[in-house]
């Protein structure tokens, strides 16, 4: 887990990330199926209806999405670590005070340079317990309630 106040001056300029909308839920579902074996479906709709922001990145190298709540990512899912990093930076750019980036596992080492570059502190947290075939789950930062 990483937490703290984001150093705004260290956020990269010209991130290739845009605000998403309901039409982008199809893209999110396709990325989810590739990474976790199933789409989030109503979970994403619920997050957006309760005030979270959908962020989208897509280019020739891949695509992905993030759901941010006051700068803390609830989900980051992408087809490449580079796109996941840009999406995480875009979440942090929306910071409103302290943020938390949860569920950084060994498979998510792409997130470490981002959180350290943003001035956040790393700390250990509890385990992630899974069962069955969930897909690669990388590059992916899950939501606690909506793995």
Question: What would you call each of these model-derived segments?
Answer:
Residues 13-147:
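Intrinsically disordered, low-complexity, positively biased terminal segments
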Residues 1-14:
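Active-site-adjacent scaffolding segments
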């Amino acid at each position: 887990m990483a937490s703290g106040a984001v150093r705004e001056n260290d956020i990269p300029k010209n991130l290739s990330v845009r605000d998403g909308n309901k039409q982008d839920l199809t893209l999110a579902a396709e990325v989810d199926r590739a990474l976790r074996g199933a789409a989030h479906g109503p979970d994403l709709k619920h997050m957006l209806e309760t005030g979270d922001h959908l962020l989208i990145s897509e280019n020739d190298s891949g695509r992905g999405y993030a759901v941010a709540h006051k700068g803390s990512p609830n989900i980051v899912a992408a087809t490449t670590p580079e796109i996941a990093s840009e999406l995480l930076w875009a979440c942090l750019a929306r910071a409103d005070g302290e943020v938390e980036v949860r569920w950084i596992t060994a498979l998510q080492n792409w997130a470490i340079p981002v959180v350290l570059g943003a001035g956040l502190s790393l700390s250990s947290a509890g385990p992630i317990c899974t069962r069955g075939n969930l897909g690669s789950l990388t590059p992916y930062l899950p939501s606690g309630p909506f793995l």
